[in-house]
């Protein structure tokens, strides 16, 4: 049986932390930032943990 291919789009968007959690970037901080407050842009920086409901599907896409 051939090897499973990981979903290349998912592999660019999600990383696995040291403890095994899936990490993602928050949406809404790429462009059109001029009208957003500094408070909002600060809230959107950093990484977030993927929802437990979405994690199994994403793990399957990553081949984990």
Curated annotation (Swiss-Prot):
<keyword id="KW-0687">Ribonucleoprotein</keyword>
<keyword id="KW-0689">Ribosomal protein</keyword>
<protein>
    <recommendedName>
        <fullName>Large ribosomal subunit protein bL35</fullName>
    </recommendedName>
</protein>
<feature type="compositionally biased region" description="Basic residues">
    <location>
        <begin position="23"/>
        <end position="33"/>
    </location>
</feature>
<feature type="compositionally biased region" description="Basic residues">
    <location>
        <begin position="1"/>
        <end position="15"/>
    </location>
</feature>
<dbReference type="InterPro" id="IPR001706">
    <property type="entry name" value="Ribosomal_bL35"/>
</dbReference>
<dbReference type="GO" id="GO:0022625">
    <property type="term" value="C:cytosolic large ribosomal subunit"/>
</dbReference>
<dbReference type="Pfam" id="PF01632">
    <property type="entry name" value="Ribosomal_L35p"/>
</dbReference>
<dbReference type="InterPro" id="IPR021137">
    <property type="entry name" value="Ribosomal_bL35-like"/>
</dbReference>
<feature type="region of interest" description="Disordered">
    <location>
        <begin position="1"/>
        <end position="37"/>
    </location>
</feature>
<dbReference type="GO" id="GO:0006412">
    <property type="term" value="P:translation"/>
</dbReference>
<dbReference type="InterPro" id="IPR037229">
    <property type="entry name" value="Ribosomal_bL35_sf"/>
</dbReference>
<comment type="similarity">
    <text>Belongs to the bacterial ribosomal protein bL35 family.</text>
</comment>
<dbReference type="InterPro" id="IPR018265">
    <property type="entry name" value="Ribosomal_bL35_CS"/>
</dbReference>
<dbReference type="GO" id="GO:0003735">
    <property type="term" value="F:structural constituent of ribosome"/>
</dbReference>
